[in-house]
Amino acid sequence: MNDSVKKMLEYNRVFVDHEMYQRYATTKYPDRKIAILSCMDTRMTELLPAALGIKNGDVKLIKNAGGQITHPYGSVIFSLLVAVYELGVDTILVIGHDDCG
């Protein structure tokens, strides 16, 4: 097993044992009623929420390569349909960036 995976699993054990997840508790319904489709670029992991002032529970965040909708019956459309029709989303944002990678 990769050393990075081992470290993540060890951290997760401590995280669960000490109930550190409690501070992230929220419902499945996005408080701001927004869904965001964005790129899965690792540089965006913390940058996008920080740049938009969003936190856990605020929005439904959907990420894929390039932040694209590539098929009319694909997982991105399915996720957006669930967000709108089941979770109360009324606004969808598609957010891209330069130098995707």
Where are these regions (language model features)?
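Short, conserved "active-site rim" segments that organize catalytic pockets and cofactor/ligand binding
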Residues: 1-70
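Short HxH-centered metal-ligating active-site micro-motif
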Residues: 56-101
